[in-house]
Regions:
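C-terminal membrane-cytosol helix-exit motif in multi-pass small-molecule transporters
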Residues: 109-130, 368-376
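Juxtamembrane intracellular "pre-TM" segments in multi-pass secondary transporters
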Residues: 125-211, 228
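Transmembrane alpha-helix termini and helix-breaking/packing motifs in multi-pass membrane transporters
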Residues: 76-99, 224, 228-229, 339-359
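Short amphipathic helix-loop junctions that connect adjacent transmembrane helices
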Residues: 220-236
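Structural signature of the two symmetry-related core transmembrane helices
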Residues: 1-15, 266-281, 362
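Helix-to-loop junctions at the C-terminal end of transmembrane segments
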Residues: 87, 251-264, 348-349
Length: 387
C-alpha cells in the first residue's frame, strides 16, 4: 500500500506538470493525495503510524513519534526552501511563472518514484508485527473459548443455570436488541474497531474540529497572506517557511521529554494552546519582521502536539485496532481540513477580510484544546498508568 501511494504521488506530479484541465488537476490532486499544507495527508499515514507503534515499546513510543515528526518537518522545510529558491531562480532566467511551477512539480513526481523505491526496500518487520498483533488477539479468543469449555465440564449445573438466565434475558431483550447487536457487529466489521470505538469516534470529532480550524491557515494560505499583506517574493517565502518547519521539527524532540514528565494530554494542551494565541496575533503585527517573528515563535511550539497526539491514539486503542484507529482519525482530520479552504478563498478575494482566517483558526483550535483536556485528561495511556 505504501508503494502504491508513492506511485500515485508520482502520477499526480506528472499530471500537474502536463495539463491545465481543472477537472484533471482536481482528480490528480485527490488521488495523488497532494497536500496544500506541506504535510502528509491521506490513508497511508495510518499505516506508517500503526507500523511504528508495533515495533517499539510503550515507553519509547512517544520519542519515536517525535523523531518521526522531526524527519517530516525537516523534509518539509527543505521542500519549502527548494521550491521557493528554484522557482525564484527559474523566473530570474526570464521563465514565466507557470512553467517554473511546472518544473517544481516535476521534481515532486521524481521524488514520488524515489519514495516507491525506498518503500520497496523497507524491512518486513513492521508488517510481521501487525500480523503478530492479530495472531495474539486470535490466541486470546481461543484461550477464552477453551476456558469456557473447561468450565462447562467442571461446573455443568452452574453453567446450566447461567445459560437459562441468559436465554431469558435474550428473550426479554427482543428483536430490538438483536438488531442493535447486529448493527454494532456490522459497524465493527466495517470500521475495524470494536472496544475502542467510543474513544476513537470522540477523538475523531475533536481532531476534525482542530483540522477545520487549521485549514484556514495552512502553509500555502499563510504564504499567500504574506504576499497579499507585505508583497513577499517566493524566494523569501521559501526561507520563512524553511525556518518555520525547522523550529517545528526540533520542538518535537522536546515534546517527547515533556510528555514523559507531565503526560501526553497535558503536553498536547499546554503547548498547543499558547501557539493558537500567537496565531491570532500574527495578522495584528504592523511590520513584516514582527509578523515573521510571531509566526516562527508559534511554529516552535505549535507542532509539539503532533507526536504526542499520534502516540496517544496508538496508546489508548487495542494493538489490533491501531491501523483502523489511525485511519479513522486521519480521515476525520482530512475531512475537517477540506471544508475550511472554501471560506478562505472567499475571504482572500476581499482585502478587508484577509486577516479573518487567522482569527477563526485560532479561536477554533483553542476550543479544541479545552474540549480535549476536559474529555480525555482521565483517559491515560498504559505507560502513564504503570508509573
Amino acid at each position: 500500500m505504501l508503494i502504491f501511494g508513492a506511485v500515485l504521488m508520482a502520477g499526480a506530479g506528472i499530471a500537474f506538470a502536463s495539463t491545465r484541465n481543472l477537472w484533471l488537476l482536481l482528480l490528480a490532486g485527490t488521488i495523488g493525495v497532494i497536500s496544500p499544507s506541506g504535510h502528509e495527508v491521506g490513508p497511508f499515514l495510518s499505516i506508517e503510524q500503526a507500523a511504528l507503534s508495533d515495533v517499539v515499546t510503550d515507553r519509547t513510543r512517544t520519542e519515536v513519534f517525535a523523531w518521526y515528526t522531526l524527519a517530516g518537518s525537516l523534509a518539509t522545510a527543505l521542500g519549502a526552501l527548494a521550491g521557493g529558491t528554484l522557482t525564484h531562480a527559474l523566473r530570474a532566467t526570464s521563465m514565466t511563472p507557470v512553467p517554473s511551477y511546472r518544473m517544481v512539480v516535476m521534481l515532486y513526481a521524481v521524488l514520488g518514484v524515489l519514495l516507491a523505491f525506498l518503500f520497496a526496500r523497507l524491512s518486513p518487520a513492521a508488517e510481521a508485527s501487525i500480523l503478530r498483533s492479530q495472531s495474539n488477539a486470535l490466541a486470546t479468543l481461543q484461550h477464552e473459548e477453551r476456558s469456557r469449555t473447561n468450565n462447562t465440564k467442571r461446573k455443568p449445573f452452574f453453567l446450566y443455570l447461567r445459560a437459562l438466565r441468559d436465554f431469558v434475558s435474550r428473550r426479554r431483550a427482543g428483536t430490538a436488541s438483536r438488531r442493535k447487536g447486529a448493527f454494532r457487529a456490522t459497524l465493527a466489521g466495517l470500521s475495524g474497531i470494536d472496544r475502542s470505538r467510543p474513544v476513537v469516534f470522540k477523538l475523531s470529532g475533536l481532531f476534525a474540529l482542530d483540522a477545520f480550524g487549521g485549514g484556514f491557515v495552512i502553509q500555502s494560505f499563510a504564504a499567500y497572506w504574506f504576499y497579499l499583506r507585505f508583497g513577499v517574493n517566493p524566494g523569501t517565502l521559501g526561507a520563512i517557511f524553511f525556518w518555520a518547519n525547522i523550529f517545528a521539527g526540533l520542538s518535537a524532540l522536546l515534546a517527547s521529554r515533556l510528555a514523559a514528565r507531565f503526560g501526553l494530554i497535558k503536553t498536547m494542551v499546554a503547548t498547543h494552546l499558547p501557539s493558537n494565541i500567537l496565531l491570532i496575533l500574527v495578522p495584528l503585527m504592523p511590520t513584516l519582521s514582527l509578523a515573521v517573528l510571531v509566526l516562527l515563535v508559534r511554529f516552535s511550539i505549535s507542532q509539539m502536539d503532533v507526536p504526542t497526539r499520534q502516540s496517544y491514539i496508538m496508546a489508548v486503542v487495542r494493538p489490533e485496532e491501531r491501523s483502523a484507529a489511525a485511519g479513522i482519525t486521519g480521515v476525520a482530520r482530512t475531512i475537517g481540513a477540506t471544508i475550511s479552504p472554501l471560506f478562505v478563498g472567499f475571504m482572500f478575494t476581499r482585502p478587508a477580510l484577509i486577516n479573518v482566517p487567522f482569527f477563526i483558526a485560532g479561536t477554533l483550535k483553542i476550543l479544541y484544546d479545552l474540549l480535549l483536556y476536559r474529555e480525555f485528561i482521565t483517559v491515560r495511556p498504559p505507560e502513564e498508568v504503570r508509573e
